[in-house]
Amino acid sequence: MHQIERAAAVEQKKLLTNLLPHEIAERMLKGENRIADEEESVSIFFSDIIGFTAIAKHCSPVDLLSELDEYFSIYDTLALKHGIEKIKTIGDAYMAVCGIPKKVDDHALRMANFAKDIVKASKEFTFNGKHIEIRIGIHSGPVIAGVIGLQKFAYDLWGDAVNIASRLESTGKPNSIHISNDFLESLTKQMGEQPASVSMGETMLKNRGAMQTYLLQMD
């Protein structure tokens, strides 16, 4: 009986760590069943593939999933390299965060380096034999994070900062990193100097109005 219980516990831990961030899985395994955290400053990342719907029309379902899996595996590898937490993928979109659930003081710097590596890798990637272009949006601000679901757990983020990052992505330029002034200020503070960027002036963001934004320059 004890062996069965131990095996079940091992399987439960394996399942949770595959679904949730390590820190969150550990808390749930210790009996914490309502996880809701708040962090005042994190960096949130969104990206998507430009014209993906048209690209997908020329792929079989098997080829489409195979290509997406290969492509997002690059993201996952780079996220691990830079200490970025993947939140989810939705179709061709990728959402990630730095600064929660593990608090770090250099979340903007980590995210900037991650985004630059993503742009470089994406330029070299071919989807169904064709090169792709992506948009990236990044914002720094406060979020609420937690686990929802009874049988199928999901770790997610909520807050205005999430919406802003998403809007920055959708209004971005091809193969560029579209950032908010809040992210630029956080990055400048963490670098000790202002990074190279190009002002986009005031960008109209849906449900937010005009916001000063920038394109972060590649190294």
Question: Where would I find each of the regions flagged by the language model?
Answer:
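A conserved hydrophobic position in a structured secondary element of the catalytic/binding core
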Residues: 20, 47, 179
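Interdomain signal-transducing alpha-helical coiled-coil linkers
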Residues: 1-9, 18, 22
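Catalytic NTP-binding/metal-coordinating core of nucleotidyl cyclase/transferase enzymes
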Residues: 6, 10-14, 26-110
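Short, surface-exposed loop/helix-turn segments at secondary-structure junctions
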Residues: 148-159
